[in-house]
């Protein structure tokens, strides 16, 4: 069994019982995920059992990245990048602490986050 309850088929199960599957690996540490139940909103797992993992999810129409989550060496989310507008910031990120989003905090992307977003947006081009 691999990261976040993943099995050989690439499935993951979060603590809230959302099921995910790996659609594509951009590199050995960056995975594009989809929820198996397409009726649900687009989300990413709260934890990863693979240290330093990066997960991304595309919009339902597949035209752009919606979310990117970066996890620490303990599998807890460090931050989540959103490409939707939030308080005039588009894109932006929300920091996480101890496995939970920091309440009401939103920031413009830092340079390393911008590079990561570009890498994921351009992976198939």
What does each of the following model-derived ranges do?
Residues 2-125:
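Catalytic toxin/effector domains delivered as secreted proteins or via bacterial secretion systems
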